Amino acid sequence: MISSTVAAPSHGTRNYVIVTLAYWGFTLTDGALRMLVLLHFFRLGYSPFTLAFLFLLYEAAGIAANLVGGWLATRFGIARMLAVGLSTQIAGFLMLSAVSPGWGATLSVAWVVVAQGVCGVAKDLTKTASKSAIKLTAGDASGRLFKWVAFFTGSKNAMKGGGFFLGG
């Protein structure tokens, strides 16, 4: 039972916390994923150019997802887009876990590039949905919105760095 002197957290605050925690989990694993892929192929002796190529589709797919992400969120809802983004990241992880040491170099690199593309779509769908959800959660309180977005953005970057360390 909540006492009358302590206010219950608002529905908007609860949604903000849920979205932020989901995005933190996503960002932590995304940073770790990038480091694991990079270090794995570096250890196998791949050139810097090939290592950069591994992330080409990741970034290109992210651009495409950004272009349609807002429209998808409007059409299907922000919560659904957040769930789709998180699910797509899991699909990308499962694809990466299927890489076999017995595969040839060309097949391994091609498979990882496609899996990275899936993760690039996931990244931008999740980011678009998360930032949109935060803006809707704050309602008309623009000062509070600014603080929430600043915290969300800063914490996102900190989690990404944590993911790099986790993956390294």
Identify what each model region corresponds to:
Residues 59-67, 160-161:
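Residue-level signature of mid-helix packing/kink "hotspots" within the transmembrane helices
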Residues 24, 92, 105-126:
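Hydrophobic core of transmembrane alpha-helices in multi-pass small-molecule transporters
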Residues 115-155:
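Cytoplasmic helix-loop-helix junction between adjacent transmembrane helices
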Residues 87-105:
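C-terminal ends and interior cores of transmembrane alpha-helices
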Residues 9-60:
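Helix-loop boundary and gating motifs at the non-cytosolic
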Residues 39, 162-168:
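Transmembrane alpha-helix termini and helix-breaking/packing motifs in multi-pass membrane transporters
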Residues 65-78:
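Helix-to-loop junctions at the C-terminal end of transmembrane segments
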